[in-house]
Amino acid sequence: MKLAIIGVGNMGGAVCEGMFRKGMDAHYQIMASDASAEKLEALKAQYPKREITTDNKQAAKDAGIVIVAVKPWLVKPVVEQLQMSENQIYVSIAAGVDFAQLESITGLKNQPMFRVIPNTAISDQQSMTLICKCHTSTEQEALINELFGCLGRILIIPESKMAAATSISSCGIAYVFKYIQASIQAGIELGLTAQEARLLTLQTLTGATTILSEHGEHPATEIEKVCTPGGITIKGINQLEHDGFTSAVINAMKASM
């Protein structure tokens, strides 16, 4: 089956990388398209044998799956150019563009559509990817679930939850990076080298997520285990709350919707 990826910017490029690294081009004829020849050449330099084009319409022609990974304000002009049919599965990776808008753009009332929101970790097959569907068959749903399930974890949700979930998984990865950056900066100020602070921070995060993933504990339970009475950790936790850490995280998530 031919699979077209329209747009190879930050997210579209990450999707391409994830698929190529996973070897999915052994199962799909993947063609990447972008208006920027420079972006395509950068992709081609990494993956020389892959098909690329600056002609979006040519990329989408005869494709069973068309993944449109362009900025939300570019969805309308790009999709109108593709002239897709109801025989093609349309996958939109554009936050905030709902199914009603997509149907209006395509002019097709029964086209199988998926809204898919990954995060940039999809390039390393570690994405948390959100999927919702419209006018799709069981077979089409299984196909898309398997496709993105190979690139991390997936969560099937109704469209009504897409904005909230996007703020946690797709935007949230940037907030995690922000914490990592702050932790490394703190380590340097405290006398560690950047490399030492980076190692300590990343492994600590890995350990924390492993505990929660493997044992299903509530974060508060694990915090309590570390905070001994009169100890240094509870002092740090109290300082975080004094400085508005919890409120800042919640407000960032809400602002992202």
Model-found features: residue ranges?
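Rossmann-like NAD(P)(H) cofactor-binding subdomain of soluble oxidoreductases
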Residues: M31, A37, N56-I131
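NAD(P)-dependent Rossmann-like dehydrogenase/reductase catalytic/cofactor-binding core
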Residues: L202-M257
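Hydrophobic packing residues within well-ordered alpha-helices of enzyme cores
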Residues: V15, M19, L40-L43, V78-L82, ...
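Small-residue helix-packing motif on alpha-helices
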Residues: I30, L40, A59, T193-L200, ...
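Internal alpha-helical scaffold of NAD(P)-dependent oxidoreductase catalytic cores
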Residues: Q101-P112, M128-A165, V176-E214, A255
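Short pre-catalytic strand/loop immediately N-terminal to key active-site residues, enriched for Gly-Thr
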Residues: M113-F114, M162-S167, P219-E224
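NAD(P)+-binding Rossmann beta1-loop-alpha1 motif at the extreme N-terminus of oxidoreductases
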Residues: M1-T54, Q58-K61, Q126, I188-L190
